[in-house]
């Protein structure tokens, strides 16, 4: 009886696997659905619904699969030959989820984006970042007790191999924080390069931080160990105390809400930095009343129709590019009225006002680290 039951289980498993193989064969005839980086150059099948002629990924809001995603997974491509083997994998390539080691970061300068991203290319895309495009953005979680999982807390920015900067209010009442580096799409584990999860050993809030009315909303997360820099994990540069960004269009990233739903793929919004007087006027008309004045330590960005950061984006960076192409951390998402919109800018921590405080803690922690800063 036991032998018969064992045979039935084996048969069912074989049938399921065969069904999966047949389904994949129909989607990707003569090939395998694999991660793009496992497919040798030039071996994309190029006669299926035009999808592989462009070697671009179709992606819409909410990660819907469009008509050109023949593998039913936007991170997979139809590859006409067996994929390139990895050093540790001997599995059937169609079933392999092996990650490859990312190339080391040969450019040790801070503030260097991967323009256009790595590996993938999202098409028809205006508000999502490319994979590893902004390697300093950090996904911060709070671990659940008696569980290996965690809840998303906020965004952060890598400024040093042991330091992440974020907003103070997002850390209020939070314990067991973990900083995740190299995150992009929170709905999948099929990203090509491995993430690094590192415990937060200490949270250092600005000594003058006040929640209500909010002031000096900045905090440092000291990591339990150094993050390992790679092509998809690199720090951003800090600004100079005298830097001003009014009139520039800068980039903000995060996984906050969009149309009421938290984003899976890291967002990318390009926003104008607005002068203090203009921002104060806009916020007064937006509902804060005729006597409101923007406090020192904040700057404003946005104020455009249907483009702004939202709930869940707190702590995320506002990065501005210098003439040389280097990015500096101009702001940190702090607060706003609703999710912003036309004539309702978002409010960010003005990082240039806190550079001295940040540098003092870098010295106090004996964490001196030199970069080739291209200004």
What are these regions (language model features)?
Residues 42, 49, 53-63, 137-149, ...:
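Extracellular trypsin-like serine protease catalytic domains
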Residues 154-155, 168, 315-317:
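Beta-propeller and closely related beta-sheet repeat lectin domains
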Residues 13-165, 178, 183, 369-375:
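Protease-domain processing segments flanking chymotrypsin-fold serine proteases, especially trypsin-like
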Residues 1-10:
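Classical eukaryotic N-terminal signal peptides for Sec-dependent ER targeting/secretion
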Residues 75-80, 219-222, 351-361:
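Short, structured beta-strand segments at or near domain termini in extracellular proteins/domains
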Residues 112-116, 136, 140-143, 164-167, ...:
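Conserved H-D interstitial segment of serine endopeptidase catalytic domains
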Residues 128, 132, 189-194, 210-215, ...:
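Gly/Ser-enriched beta-turn/beta-hairpin loop segments
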Residues 192, 204-210, 226-270:
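Active-site substrate-binding loop(s) of clan PA
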């Amino acid at each position: 009886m036991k032998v018969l039951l064992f045979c039935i289980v084996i048969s069912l498993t074989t049938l399921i696997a065969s069904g999966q193989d047949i389904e994949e064969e129909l989607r990707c005839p003569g090939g395998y659905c694999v991660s793009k980086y496992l497919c040798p150059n030039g071996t994309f099948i190029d006669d299926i619904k035009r999808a592989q002629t462009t070697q671009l990924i179709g992606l819409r809001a909410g990660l819907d699969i469009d008509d050109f995603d023949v593998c039913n997974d936007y991170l997979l491509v139809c590859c006409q030959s067996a994929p390139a083997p990895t050093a540790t994998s001997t599995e059937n390539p169609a079933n392999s989820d092996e990650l490859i080691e990312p190339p080391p970061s040969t450019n040790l300068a801070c503030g260097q984006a991967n323009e256009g991203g790595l590996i993938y290319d999202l098409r028809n895309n205006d508000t999502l970042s490319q994979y590893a495009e902004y390697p300093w953005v950090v996904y911060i979680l709070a671990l659940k007790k008696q569980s290996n999982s965690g809840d998303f807390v906020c965004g952060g920015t890598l400024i040093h191999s042991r330091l992440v900067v974020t907003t103070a209010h997002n850390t209020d009442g939070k314990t067991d924080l973990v900083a995740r580096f190299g995150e992009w799409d929170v709905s999948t584990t099929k990203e090509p390069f491995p993430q690094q999860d590192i415990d937060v050993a200490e949270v250092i809030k600005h000594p003058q931080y006040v929640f209500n009315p909010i002031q000096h909303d900045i905090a440092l997360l000291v990591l339990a160990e150094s993050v390992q820099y790679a092509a998809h994990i690199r720090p951003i540069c800090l600004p100079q105390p005298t830097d001003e960004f009014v009139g520039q269009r800068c980039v903000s990233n995060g996984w906050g809400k969009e149309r009421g739903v938290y984003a899976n793929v890291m967002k990318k919004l390009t926003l104008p930095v607005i002068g203090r007087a203009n921002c104060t006027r806009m916020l007064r008309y937006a509902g804060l009343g005729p006597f409101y004045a923007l406090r020192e330590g904040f700057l404003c960005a946005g104020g455009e129709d249907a483009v702004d950061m939202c709930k869940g984006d707190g702590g995320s960076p506002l990065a501005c590019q210098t003439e040389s192409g280097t990015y500096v951390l101009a702001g940190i998402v702090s607060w706003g009225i609703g999710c912003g919109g036309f004539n309702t800018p978002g409010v960010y921590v003005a990082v240039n006002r806190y550079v001295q405080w940040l540098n003092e803690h870098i010295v106090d922690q004996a964490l001196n680290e030199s970069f080739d800063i291209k200004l």
